[in-house]
Regions:
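A glycine-rich helix N-cap at a beta->alpha junction
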Residues: 17-21
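Alpha/beta enzyme core
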Residues: 2-12, 25-111
Length: 111
């Protein structure tokens, strides 16, 4: 990833770098490290499972999802990173689960 963003900068490419990770600070920290090292912005696309199947398999509830989302967005915003929340298996997710997640993400600075 470092070499990629350095090439984007060196070649003056008119594209934005983006990286995906889970909604966990330990996944976003390396992205921030690359931004700090290179000075090239990288958009963060952070994903979390939100379907009933994923909630059951992980033994999660909405408050667990919210905690992961809040921690990762606060970290990203503090690091100056643009953040986009991505929900996995969204088609099977319930609106009453998705609504508070996306509203909170937007409130905290996600785009």
């Amino acid at each position: 990833m470092t070499a990629l963003v350095q090439e984007i900068s060196r070649s003056k490419l008119k594209i934005k770098a983006a990286a995906a990770g889970r909604t966990m600070v330990r996944d976003i920290q390396p992205i921030s490290d690359i931004v700090q090292k290179t000075g090239v912005p990288i958009e963060v696309y952070a994903f979390i499972g939100s379907s009933p199947i994923r909630l059951f398999a992980e033994d999660w509830d909405v408050s667990t999802l919210m905690g992961h989302i809040e921690d990762s967005i606060k970290f990203s915003v503090n690091e100056g990173l643009e953040y986009c929340l991505v929900t996995e298996d969204t088609i099977r997710s319930r609106p009453e689960v998705l609504d508070p997640l996306f509203r909170r993400a937007i409130d905290l600075g996600a785009f």
